């Protein structure tokens, strides 16, 4: 699993589980507010007066209204198994080398 997912998922899951109000800033500067209802590899479902499906590629920053504990409780140090999918084989998570194009 990619390192980004192993940080993202416990953080988002803690926000969802504890119903923490969040501000989500998009790459175009728009600020969305609400609670994370659910999420998967590509989207976050944000609920306020309405539910909005927000694509992760459009998100710049997720800011919780209060501190949350998002430590992984798996004693083996691995990732919890609450993910709803995996990265397709056709999409590598990291480039293999640092060669310039």
Curated annotation (Swiss-Prot):
Residues 63-101 are annotated as: Disordered. Pfam families: Hfq. GO terms for cellular component: cytosol. Residues 9-68 form the Sm domain. InterPro entries: Hfq, LSM_dom_sf, Sm. Residues 70-86 have a biased composition (Low complexity). Keywords: RNA-binding, Stress response. One of its GO terms (biological process) is regulation of translation, ncRNA-mediated. Gene3D superfamilies: 2.30.30.100. It comes from the Bacteria. One of its GO terms (molecular function) is RNA binding. Belongs to the Hfq family. Homohexamer. HAMAP family: Hfq. RNA chaperone that binds small regulatory RNA (sRNAs) and mRNAs to facilitate mRNA translational regulation in response to envelope stress, environmental stress and changes in metabolite concentrations. Also binds with high specificity to tRNAs. This is RNA-binding protein Hfq. The gene is hfq.
């Amino acid at each position: 699993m990619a390192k980004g997912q192993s940080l993202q998922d416990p953080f988002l899951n803690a926000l969802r589980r504890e119903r923490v109000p969040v501000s989500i800033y998009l790459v175009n500067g728009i600020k969305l507010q609400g609670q994370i209802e659910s999420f998967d590899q590509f989207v976050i479902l944000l609920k306020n007066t309405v539910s909005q499906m927000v694509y992760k590629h459009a998100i710049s920053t997720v800011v919780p209204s209060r501190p949350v504990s998002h430590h992984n409780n798996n004693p083996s140090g691995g990732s919890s198994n609450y993910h709803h999918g995996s990265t397709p084989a056709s999409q590598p998570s990291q480039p293999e080398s640092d060669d310039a194009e």
